[in-house]
Amino acid sequence: MTRSVDVRTRDRGQDATVDPAAFWAGDWATALGRHGERAAEDALLLDLAPLTIRVDGRPWTLRVGADGLEAQAGVEGAAVVDLDEEAFADLVREERTALGLVIAGRVGGAGPAHELFCAWDPVLRSVLDGRHLHRPGEVTLLTPDGAPLDLDQRFHLDDGREAPAHFLAEAGFALLCDVFTEAELDGLDAELAAAVDAARPDDGASWWAATSGGERYPCRILDLVEQSPGLRALLDDPRFLAIGQVLDDGHRPGDPFGEHFSDLTAEGLLKRVGSVEGLACLPWHKDCERGGHSMFCSGLTIGICLTPVDLAHGGLDVVAGSHRAHIARRQVDAGLDLPVATLAADRGDVTVHLSCALHRSTHPTSAERRVIYTGFALPARPGDAEADGADHARLLRERAAIAGRQDDAMASLQRPS
């Protein structure tokens, strides 16, 4: 049975102009007519206080009223966020989520208002896109025959496509064993080490962390594909290309976040024991959490394991089936009914997870972890527009700025939002 993970509903490159007053009176009101009842239930589920979104000085307040969700002109309560029209348009079209705008430094207002803004974001999507919040029992994990899915399965490239395709589409992740040779891994290790040595804190192309002993080190090299000839060769290797062909969605080597479509991207991650500061490990998140889900998902994020993935080296946990659920941060904090799979991989294995699968990395306890993340993007739709040079530069700056604003990013990811 063919399984698809292409859940796109919106073309990239739509008209960038969104007039706030016309939006609230027009598109918003129309969407409320279609999805408002369930979206109001979502807002009540999250226990959301009123939030005022002020766009270039013009305020509208979101709240749950007696008749459901309301967007009223004016200010109500203390929680006010400020956006310009470009940021508001990005929010409406889901080019950026509330979290993505906060991380990019494009939201005015106080910190608590930022948290409430992020908390309202899933309800905005519930209204505008009909993506309602997950309820217990809505996602099941089954084999093609209807039996419970064994989440500890491992696959090889010569197993054929049917079994890994079903598992990946059902669970949102997969583990492929023995993909690359020791010689190839040694070459990648050497090129990653050279990139780490060349990195500087202000280079705009790396994230930095610190250990309890005070050592600062580059924990993520953002432009590794440009610094690693060996990696570029492997990304054109039939073994790697076969991973993108497991599903029938036409995935091709490219940015797994979707933002750069067919541009090859790769990041080298280094996680040292005792890291206590920085973004060496990310808490529970979806790769599309900063925006673009309705335009790009699901891409395939590929992790080339240069060290084992285990308790000693640090792990990778995935909430199985979470790519098929719209999940708010407050639901994550309260606990989900979906099982958590803890991946155990060896050097040379490859992890695969979908861009909208909820996952986290855990700190190493006794040995350094090294991994290279790259991936596959869905092919552009007929109405899509590739990012131009200015967009490309902005995307790179925003990606680099995540670490520069790590306190805000971690707060938004870890606290109820």
Question: Positions of the model-derived regions?
Answer:
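Short glycine/proline-enriched turns and hinge-like loops at secondary-structure junctions
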Residues: 63-64, 74, 294-296, 364-367
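Short Gly/aromatic-enriched secondary-structure transition segments
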Residues: 67-70, 189-193, 318-320
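Feature captures hydrophobic
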Residues: 1-159
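Histidine-centered metal-chelating micro-motifs
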Residues: 89, 289-290, 356-360
